Amino acid sequence: WALFINWFNVPYNKKRDQAYLIRKEDLLFVKKDQKINKNFCSFVASNPSGKRLDFVPKLHSKKYVDCGGSLLNNTGKKIKGRGDQKWKIKYISNFRFNIAFENEIGHGYVTEKILHPMSVNSIPIYWGSDFVNEDFNSESFINATNYEDDEELIAEILDLETNKELYLEKLAE
């Protein structure tokens, strides 16, 4: 089992899944010949903080990014969040990449943002804790802090997008 923990101290509410369990059997593990997710990139967030406000429009100007949260929404409907994480996970399972930017950089501050896309074969584009490599395989996601600037980061994303073999190698990590 993989356990989603309510990171937000949301009081108990029968309409929300505070601890959303994902059965190990339901986690997706990529195979080289597996069909890859249908759409390019998703972004789901509500907090207008951090680097996300700058980066998402830059990537979107190069290739369409579906923004399903309340922040920068361009889908016409908002994905539930803050406890209803199963809807977010289902949504991002349709995308090859997910922008997984934390609200801020903090030592050891790693939230569900990197784990959700990994659980549904979507490569996280992560910005956040400098300790993320201690908990996750650094080859399994794109760490935005490893790039000189956003243009270099976007070039890497678009390279993976156009090269199926490279994309599948990263996804298989």
Task: Map each language-model feature to its residues.
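Residues that scaffold, gate, or flank divalent-cation-dependent active/transport sites
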Residues: 68
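Pol beta-like nucleotidyltransferase catalytic core
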Residues: 1-64, 73-100, 107-173
